[in-house]
């Protein structure tokens, strides 16, 4: 499914909660009142976006004619929490740009997405613009693909702990690894990449 803006995600969560509590969908006025949207025109705009992105279906002739696509299946809406470079070290951008709903079976402990920038991981089928699902954890095993902070800057690489050093290895033969020798820098694992999601425009 396509990504949601924070406001669209808020509308969708309200629809899900209302359906769970009452067993039927809210009216547009219910949505407007709960989310403090002035008038039903603003609500209609959000519902149109949710329908276009495949999250809901609407029956124009029914004031409560809203149904959730896949309602009853278990899904989770996770934040897209910023950008991480698959390339040279750069500061991470921690700014929620939207949300993406995925089936809970795909979570694998993932808590948030980061949008990948760069092409250093192309041979691991991780492309520029992909969404990497991150499971927060402070440690990693050799060959894990991780988001790591090196002296305060973030990168997405394959992790290797070797004698006297840590190697953050790209999956692109044209790129050089990042080597951090003991005592020469600080490496912190943000989390492990447990899934890659690609949205089509």
Swiss-Prot record:
Signal peptide bounds: none
Gene3D superfamilies registered for this protein in UniProt? Umud Fragment, subunit A (2.10.109.10), Winged helix-like DNA-binding domain superfamily/Winged helix DNA-binding domain (1.10.10.10)
Record keyword Translocase present: no
Q: Give the catalytic activity.
A: Hydrolysis of Ala-|-Gly bond in repressor LexA
InterPro entries noted in UniProt: LexA, LexA-like, LexA/Signal_pep-like_sf, LexA_DNA-bd_dom, LexA_repressor, Peptidase_S24_LexA, Peptidase_S24_S26A/B/C, WH-like_DNA-bd_sf
**Under which main EC class is this enzyme filed?**
hydrolase
Biological process (GO) annotations held by this record are: DNA repair; DNA replication; negative regulation of DNA-templated transcription; proteolysis; SOS response
Q: Give the EC number(s) listed in the UniProt record.
A: 3.4.21.88
What keywords does the record list, in alphabetical order?
Answer: Autocatalytic cleavage, DNA damage, DNA repair, DNA replication, DNA-binding, Hydrolase, Repressor, SOS response, Transcription, Transcription regulation
**Nucleotidyltransferase among keywords:** no
* Active site, UniProt feature: 120, 157
Q: Which Pfam families match?
A: LexA_DNA_bind (PF01726), Peptidase_S24 (PF00717)
Q: Give the annotated DNA-binding region, as residue ranges.
A: 28-48
> What GO annotations for molecular function exist for this entry?
DNA binding; serine-type endopeptidase activity
**Which residues are marked as site: Cleavage?**
86-87
- Annotated NCBIfam families: lexA
Note the subunit structure. Answer: Homodimer.
The similarity comment for this entry is: Belongs to the peptidase S24 family.
> What does the UniProt record say this protein does?
Represses a number of genes involved in the response to DNA damage (SOS response), including recA and lexA. In the presence of single-stranded DNA, RecA interacts with LexA causing an autocatalytic cleavage which disrupts the DNA-binding part of LexA, leading to derepression of the SOS regulon and eventually DNA repair.
**What is the protein's name according to its record?**
LexA repressor
Q: Which gene encodes it?
A: lexA
